[in-house]
Amino acid sequence: MAAITAASNSKQIAPLPKTLLQAAVMAIELDKPICLDYYVASYNKDCKIARDGTEGDKFLYKNPEEYTSPLKGMFKVDPGPDSQDSSYDLIFETQNSIYLASGNML
């Protein structure tokens, strides 16, 4: 088994454990895959929630080639009362997938 080694100076960007647990429960109940491809972009504020026209569907948007299908639901996940961290994550449900994003994007 290969090990993943990170430089001690680099900061690991990953969803909160509570977010991963909630997403896993949703994925099992809804029979949808969990997608993390917007997490780092959302952490770096390189993606946003966009709308198709003034009354159209909302979706996650990185660029003209990378965007999700319309959003069916959005859920905020706080780190919990014992955490010193004020950051939070977001879970987005689309027709086919569950996307995790950092609250930094808002």
PLM region spans:
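N-terminal non-globular leader segments, chiefly Sec-dependent signal peptides
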Residues: M1-D89, Q95, G103-L106
